[in-house]
Amino acid sequence: VNSKANNWRFLCCGIAILAFVSGCGNADNSSAGFVRFDDGTPVRSGSVEFRSVADGSRYASRIGTDGSFTLTDQDGEPRCPPGEYEIVVVQIVLTEDLAADAHQHGGTVPRRYADYYTSGLTTTRGVADTTPLLVTLATGDE
């Protein structure tokens, strides 16, 4: 009888661990992507935000120095559900105390991309879409 109880506990622990491990991470990468200028260079600093056209929910991320990002919801969970989105890219660069050759923020994002009304950036994610999100900004566009 005692060995049956131990087997049952072992099975329950195994199921719990399997459920925990399989729920971790974002295996489909549906919230990952890149922000680049139209000449192919990455946006090296700032943040990106996607706003759902359907319900206004927002998914945001900081932009890595290689232009990469992973969108998260307001609870910090990496995700970007299927749907249509408006996009903004915001970059605040504080450089008044630096010489021009010491700036490491890369190309400057034009101000119009920081506002949903002027950015003109949109995307649609399908249900099974796991391709990386790509946000492209026009260079020299003010």
Regions found by a protein language model. Give the residues of each.
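Beta-strand-dominated extracellular/periplasmic modules and repeats
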Residues: 24-142
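Sec-dependent bacterial lipoprotein signal peptides
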Residues: 1-22
